[in-house]
C-alpha cells in the first residue's frame, strides 16, 4: 500500500475582534515572529505535500508578512465558521491524501503531538488532538459513550452536565481527503452562532460507524490559542520561559533570566554572559567569550569573539569584530562594520561606517557615512557633518590619523594617513599630506567685564 501524502490546512480567517486591533490577529508578534509564522513552521515540520492557508479579506496585510511562495491561498470572504473555511480549502486538496487541520492562532502544537496523530490515523478514519484540562471553559467538549467518541459539543451549545467534561478538543485533526469532503458537505448552521462548525464532522463520521480516535497532546499548553492581548501575553511568557531554559541548557549565562528577552534567533559560541534587561531581536550571532551589559538592545547583528558590549548600548544591523569594547551608552546603527580591537565609548553614535583595526572613538562623537582606517584615534566631541539637507556625503580617514577633541569634519572630505587634526578644528578641505591641521582662532580677553546680574521681579519678592 502506498504511503499517503499529507496536506496541511491552516485556518487563519478569523476577524480577531477581541484583540482590539486594526490588523489581523494572526499577524501579532510572539517571540519576534507573527503567530501565523509559528504555525506555518509547525506545518512545514511534517514535510507536507501542500500547505493551504485560509485567510480573510485582509489579503494585502497577511501576504505582505507571509511571503512563502509554497503556500496555496484560499479566501473566506464571509466568516461562516470553521466548517465553511475547510470546505473552501477542500478545492485545493486531493481525495487520496490525508489532511491535517491547524489553527492560525495556536502556535504551540508540537511536532511530537502531530506525529502521534499520524500514528493514530493508521488505525482510524479520523483522529482528534485533545487534552484533559482542569478548567475546560471555552473549549469544545469530547462527548464519549462507553469510550467511543460520539461528537464534539461546542461550549456555547453544551448543557450543564456536558460542560463538566474535562477532555477538550484542540481543533486539530487528521482525516482522509475524500472522507473529509463528504462530512463537510453534510454540516449545517443550526446552532446558537449560526455558523458551520468543523466539529460537526465528528457527528457525521460517527453516523457512518467510522473509527474515531482521540490523541492527547504531550503538554496541555499546546492547545492554548490567542483571542485577546491578555492571552497573547500569557503565550509570550511561556515562549520566553522556554527560550530562556533552552539558552541556559546550551551554556549561556543569564544573570537575570526573568528579565531577558529574545525576539528572534540566537546562535552562540561558548562563555556567553548576558546581564539583566538585555533585549535581542532578529537574527543574532555571538562568538565565544562575549559579555553583554545591563539594558543593551541588539538587533540582527554579528559579534565576534572576546568582545564586550557595555551597559545600555544599542546595536542594529551591525558586524563587530574580535576583542572590541562597545559602550556604555553607545549607538551603532545599520550598515556599520567594525574590525577587530575597536573601542567605541560612551555617547558615541556611528551609522553606515566601516572602521578598521585598533581604532578608537571613545567619547561623545557622531560618525556617519565614514571609512576610518586602522589605529585612528578620535577625540571627544568630534562629528562628521555628512548631510546638506538633501544628500549624504562620505568622510574617509586614513590609517594612524589623530583627531583632536571638538572637531568638525565637513563632508565630503578625505584625510590621508598619519595626519593630525588639532582640537577645535573645523575641516572643510581634504588633507593630502601627513601634517598638522588647525584653525587660527585668536583668543581675546575683555578686561573689566562683569557677569550680568539677575533681574529681581516683583513676583520673586
From Swiss-Prot:
GO terms for cellular component: cytoplasm; membrane. Its main location: cytoplasm. Its EC number is 2.7.7.23, 2.3.1.157. The active site is at 363 (proton acceptor). Residues 251-461 are annotated as: N-acetyltransferase. Pathway: Nucleotide-sugar biosynthesis; UDP-N-acetyl-alpha-D-glucosamine biosynthesis; N-acetyl-alpha-D-glucosamine 1-phosphate from alpha-D-glucosamine 6-phosphate (route II): step 2/2; Nucleotide-sugar biosynthesis; UDP-N-acetyl-alpha-D-glucosamine biosynthesis; UDP-N-acetyl-alpha-D-glucosamine from N-acetyl-alpha-D-glucosamine 1-phosphate: step 1/1; Bacterial outer membrane biogenesis; LPS lipid A biosynthesis. UDP-N-acetyl-alpha-D-glucosamine binds at residues 11-14, 25, 76, 81-82, 103-105, 140, 154, 227, 333, 351, 366, 377. Keywords: Acyltransferase, Cell shape, Cell wall biogenesis/degradation, Cytoplasm, Magnesium, Metal-binding, Multifunctional enzyme, Nucleotidyltransferase, Peptidoglycan synthesis, Repeat, Transferase. Its cofactor is Mg(2+). CDD domains: GT2_GlmU_N_bac, LbH_GlmU_C. GO terms for molecular function: glucosamine-1-phosphate N-acetyltransferase activity; magnesium ion binding; UDP-N-acetylglucosamine diphosphorylase activity. It is found in: Cytoplasm. This is Bifunctional protein GlmU. It comes from Buchnera aphidicola subsp. Schizaphis graminum (strain Sg).
Amino acid at each position: 500500500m502506498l504511503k499517503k501524502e499529507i496536506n496541511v490546512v491552516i485556518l487563519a480567517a478569523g476577524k480577531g475582534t477581541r484583540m482590539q486591533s486594526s490588523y489581523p490577529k494572526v499577524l501579532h508578534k510572539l517571540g519576534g515572529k507573527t503567530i501565523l509564522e509559528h504555525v506555518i513552521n509547525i506545518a512545514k515540520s511534517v514535510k507536507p505535500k501542500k500547505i493551504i492557508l485560509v485567510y480573510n479579506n485582509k489579503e494585502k496585510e497577511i501576504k505582505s508578512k507571509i511571503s512563502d511562495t509554497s503556500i496555496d491561498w484560499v479566501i473566506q470572504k464571509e466568516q461562516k465558521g470553521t466548517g465553511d473555511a475547510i470546505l473552501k480549502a477542500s478545492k485545493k486538496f486531493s481525495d487520496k491524501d490525508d489532511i491535517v487541520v491547524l489553527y492560525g492562532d495556536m502556535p504551540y502544537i508540537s511536532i511530537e503531538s502531530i506525529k502521534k496523530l499520524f500514528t493514530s490515523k493508521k488505525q482510524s478514519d479520523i483522529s482528534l488532538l485533545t487534552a484533559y484540562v482542569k478548567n475546560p471553559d471555552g473549549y469544545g467538549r469530547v462527548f464519549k459513550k462507553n469510550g467511543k467518541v460520539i461528537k464534539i459539543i461546542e461550549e456555547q451549545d453544551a448543557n450543564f452536565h456536558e460542560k463538566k467534561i474535562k477532555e477538550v478538543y484542540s481543533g486539530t485533526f487528521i482525516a482522509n481527503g475524500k472522507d473529509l469532503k463528504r462530512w463537510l458537505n453534510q454540516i449545517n448552521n443550526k446552532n446558537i452562532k449560526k455558523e458551520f462548525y468543523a466539529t460537526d464532522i465528528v457527528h457525521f463520521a460517527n453516523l457512518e460507524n467510522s473509527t474515531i480516535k482521540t490523541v492527547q497532546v504531550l503538554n496541555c499548553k499546546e492547545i492554548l490559542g490567542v483571542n485577546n492581548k491578555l492571552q497573547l501575553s500569557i503565550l509570550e511568557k511561556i515562549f520566553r520561559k522556554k527560550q530562556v531554559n533552552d539558552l541556559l541548557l546550551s551554556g549561556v549565562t543569564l544573570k537575570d533570566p526573568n528579565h531577558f528577552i529574545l525576539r528572534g534567533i540566537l546562535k552562540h559560541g561558548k562563555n556567553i554572559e548576558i546581564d539583566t534587561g538585555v533585549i535581542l531581536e532578529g537574527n543574532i550571532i555571538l562568538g565565544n567569550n562575549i559579555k553583554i551589559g545591563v539594558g543593551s538592545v541588539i538587533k540582527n547583528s554579528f559579534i565576534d569573539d572576546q568582545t564586550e558590549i557595555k551597559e545600555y548600548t544599542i546595536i542594529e544591523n551591525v558586524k563587530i569584530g574580535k576583542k572590541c569594547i562597545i559602550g556604555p551608552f553607545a549607538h551603532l546603527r545599520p550598515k556599520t562594520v567594525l574590525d577587530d580591537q575597536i573601542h567605541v565609548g560612551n555617547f558615541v553614535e556611528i551609522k553606515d561606517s566601516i572602521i578598521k583595526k585598533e581604532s578608537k572613538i571613545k567619547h561623545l562623537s557622531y560618525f556617519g557615512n565614514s571609512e576610518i582606517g586602522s589605529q585612528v584615534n578620535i577625540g571627544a566631541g568630534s562629528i562628521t557633518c555628512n548631510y546638506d539637507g538633501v544628500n549624504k556625503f562620505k568622510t574617509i580617514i586614513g590609517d594612524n590619523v589623530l583627531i583632536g577633541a571638538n572637531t568638525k569634519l565637513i563632508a565630503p572630505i578625505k584625510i590621508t594617513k598619519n595626519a593630525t587634526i588639532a582640537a577645535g578644528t573645523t575641516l572643510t578641505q581634504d588633507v593630502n599630506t601627513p601634517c598638522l591641521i588647525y584653525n587660527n582662532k585668536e583668543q581675546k580677553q575683555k578686561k573689566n567685564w562683569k557677569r550680568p546680574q539677575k533681574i529681581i521681579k516683583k513676583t520673586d519678592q
